[in-house]
């Protein structure tokens, strides 16, 4: 995301410079040094939503895996919600809810009835009164979700490696552009400060003499200064 942000700044500065009217300036070479990569920037920005969030559309494979995960999770929840509402099963539960333990969907079974709900125990409450059981009916589906999650992580890693390779391929011009952008940023900051302070470039004489006319220290608030005419 930081790389995409830098590439976006290269493009914004290039657009701003190209749309402004000005004579030739000593800073022109800095703007000419910028090398925007709008295609790569757009790919990164649309794929990586946040440091820990990859868009479904980052790749066809990732999109398909997430659809499978979503469909399987819905199927599991539907089956478990039907189970917890069932009168024959609900009497063995502490409450009629579906929760997660160790990445698997479970139901809270009263410890004295742990043998009445067939499945795998994944956790026990701090009081020991509740065991969290993964019902046998959804064990296989839960296992599929874990498999899909592992494949999802592998696909995300592949996408990141591919982006890294693309950025590495433009590393020399990226570094050059980045340094130019920093220099431009410093110059713009100086220009803004000069405008805020109503400062101007002094005229330098060749005889080593100088006159300070209405001069003031730039770090002292102008409102605190009384300058006699």
Language-model regions, residue ranges each:
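Long, low-complexity repetitive segments of secreted extracellular proteins
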Residues: 10, 16-17, 30-34
């Amino acid at each position: 995301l930081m790389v995409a942000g830098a590439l976006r700044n290269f493009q914004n500065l290039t657009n701003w410079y190209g749309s402004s009217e000005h004579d030739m300036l000593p800073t022109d070479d800095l703007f000419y040094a910028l090398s925007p990569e709008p295609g790569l920037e757009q790919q990164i920005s649309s794929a990586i939503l946040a440091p820990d969030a990859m868009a479904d559309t980052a790749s066809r494979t990732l999109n398909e895996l997430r659809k499978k995960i979503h469909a399987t999770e819905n199927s599991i929840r539907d089956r478990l919600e039907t189970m917890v509402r069932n009168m024959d099963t609900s009497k063995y539960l502490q409450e009629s809810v579906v929760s997660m333990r160790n990445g698997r969907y479970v139901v809270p079974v009263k410890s004295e009835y742990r043998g009445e709900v067939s499945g795998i125990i994944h956790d026990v409450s701090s009081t020991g009164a509740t065991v969290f059981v993964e019902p046998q009916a959804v064990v296989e589906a839960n296992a599929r979700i874990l498999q899909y999650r592992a494949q999802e992580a592998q696909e995300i890693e592949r996408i990141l490696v591919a982006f890294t390779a693309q950025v590495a391929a433009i590393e020399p011009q990226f570094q050059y552009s980045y340094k130019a952008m920093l220099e431009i940023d410093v110059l713009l900051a100086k220009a803004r400060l000069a405008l805020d302070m109503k400062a101007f470039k002094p005229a330098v004489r060749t005889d080593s003499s100088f006159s300070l006319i209405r001069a003031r220290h730039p770090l002292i608030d102008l409102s605190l200064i009384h300058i006699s005419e």
